[in-house]
Regions:
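Cofactor-binding beta-sheet edge motifs in enzyme active sites
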Residues: 1-180
Length: 180
């Protein structure tokens, strides 16, 4: 039986093409010493996105140094805009994965402004973000959201490589500090 339902909306061949291009562009087989890699893939809005995240741990602080993303969103109408959307989604996702924390007391959010809610800072943004597209003649599909979700799992998988422990609770930086 199919574990995710009777039918799948996604095309396994397109997923495979994304992962094949990601393996090539990320130079997956050439992981540098001291770099911990995580990978994740996601399907939404009829688009396919996958990312490899390189994490380095210095002074017991994990830092995302590099992200390589591959997206299949059909025909890319405006490549510069699509790259910008992917980069923004990736940066926002890293910020949420590592630092984003919402706490509530009696149903009221305890962090209700930017002075108490940590956002990723420019010096915490990866120095290298590469975005690549699978070239095909498929109709254009969603571009803004698909690169956002996979970065969470890719960061968690890189942290697993660094520590041997799984990270399930965000923000991961808190979990990393507790377990290191």
């Amino acid at each position: 039986t199919n574990p995710v339902g009777e039918t799948n909306d996604y095309d396994a061949g397109r997923y495979a093409a994304v992962l094949t291009l990601l393996r090539e562009k990320s130079r997956w087989a050439e992981t540098p010493a001291g770099v911990h890699r995580g990978v994740s893939a996601y399907f939404c809005h009829n688009s396919y996105a996958a990312e490899v995240v390189d994490v380095v741990v210095k002074d017991n602080i994990p830092t995302v140094e590099r992200v390589v993303a591959v997206v299949d969103c059909g025909i890319v109408v405006n490549k510069d805009a699509a790259i910008n959307m992917a980069e923004g989604a990736i940066i926002d996702g890293i910020g949420n994965a590592l630092y984003g924390e919402l706490t509530f007391k009696d149903g009221v959010p305890q962090k209700n402004n930017f002075n108490s809610y940590k956002l990723i800072r420019m010096n915490e943004v990866p120095k290298d973000i590469e975005v690549h597209f699978v070239e095909n003649e498929k109709d254009p599909t969603g571009m803004g959201e698909p690169p956002f979700p996979p970065v969470f799992a890719a960061v968690a998988n890189a942290l697993f490589k660094a520590t041997g422990r799984r990270f399930y609770n965000q923000p991961f930086i808190n979990e990393f500090a507790k377990k290191s």
